[in-house]
Amino acid sequence: MPELPEVETVARSLAPQLLSRTIVGLAKLDWPRMLTPPPPEFAALVAGRRIEAVGRRAKWLLLTLDAGWTLAIHLRMSGHLLVAEPAAADAPHVHFALDLDDGRRLIFDDQRKFGRVHLLDSTGLLALDAAHGPEPLTDDFTPAVLAERLRNRQAPIKALLLDQRLIAGIGNIYANEALWLAGIHPLTPGGTLTVDQIAALHHAIRLVLADAIANQGSSLRNYRDGYGRRGNYQEHFNVYDRVGKPCPRCQTAIERIVVAQRSTFFCPLCQVLVQ
């Protein structure tokens, strides 16, 4: 699933293609369940709306429209967005497309049909924002904020990092990578981290996410940016999906366990679980 770096990369690549464009109308929809509100209402509300900003909140891509509306798009497992010529919408896994006033289309290709497109008013946007924790790359996300988020929590730190209500945008890939960089075992109860460990984890989260954005995200399967380009960060993984391979720090074989129903990779020497 695209995480913060991938969605941020998509937003940055779509912005120059979409800013100031007007949505002419709904061009294609063959999977109505992906839309909120229902298709007839959705189509009527987006027609003629001007795209004023392209941004991100957590793992949601946000297209700010005039008249107080926002298109909130979640790519889920296999979705990707492109601005392309109209014929591109005929591809077999394109389930949603919007006509733009420059003759092109914003198309949503989603092989597994898990993606979602929500048209939100100001109240809906506030609710989406409130459902997520702080953005980890903002100045407001400090070690003290991280410590407060983890206070008294006995769940494994890996599971807590995946909880979007606590911290926004971190998914399985970057939780694994940040914990390795910080030298913290993924099963460590979040509320037991020391001040030094919290500082190390805070630094690691920000560094890993920033590096991933600089490399246009990670392309393991379907992920592409708004121009159809693959990311490169998968070439820089230290532990993710590297079971049995040597740890870049100490050469110990990387191990795999399951935490919060997700594959979890760590170095048993660099990331010791303190009982």
Curated annotation (Swiss-Prot):
Record note on cofactor: Binds 1 zinc ion per subunit.
Provide the cofactor list for this protein.
Answer: Zn(2+)
* ZnF start-end (FPG-type): 238-272
GO molecular function terms attached to this record: 8-oxo-7,8-dihydroguanine DNA N-glycosylase activity; class I DNA-(apurinic or apyrimidinic site) endonuclease activity; damaged DNA binding; zinc ion binding
The record's EC number reads 3.2.2.23, 4.2.99.18
Reactions that this protein is recorded to catalyse: Hydrolysis of DNA containing ring-opened 7-methylguanine residues, releasing 2,6-diamino-4-hydroxy-5-(N-methyl)formamidopyrimidine; 2'-deoxyribonucleotide-(2'-deoxyribose 5'-phosphate)-2'-deoxyribonucleotide-DNA = a 3'-end 2'-deoxyribonucleotide-(2,3-dehydro-2,3-deoxyribose 5'-phosphate)-DNA + a 5'-end 5'-phospho-2'-deoxyribonucleoside-DNA + H(+)
Q: SMART domains given for it?
A: Fapy_DNA_glyco (SM00898), H2TH (SM01232)
Q: Which UniProt keywords apply?
A: DNA damage, DNA repair, DNA-binding, Glycosidase, Hydrolase, Lyase, Metal-binding, Multifunctional enzyme, Zinc, Zinc-finger
User: InterPro entries, per this entry?
Assistant: DNA_glyclase/AP_lyase_DNA-bd, Formamido-pyr_DNA_Glyclase, FPG_cat, MutM-like_N-ter, Ribosomal_uS13-like_H2TH, Znf_DNA_glyclase/AP_lyase, Znf_FPG/IleRS
- Say what the protein does: Involved in base excision repair of DNA damaged by oxidation or by mutagenic agents. Acts as a DNA glycosylase that recognizes and removes damaged bases. Has a preference for oxidized purines, such as 7,8-dihydro-8-oxoguanine (8-oxoG). Has AP (apurinic/apyrimidinic) lyase activity and introduces nicks in the DNA strand. Cleaves the DNA backbone by beta-delta elimination to generate a single-strand break at the site of the removed base with both 3'- and 5'-phosphates.
Family under the similarity heading: Belongs to the FPG family.
Q: What is this protein called?
A: Formamidopyrimidine-DNA glycosylase
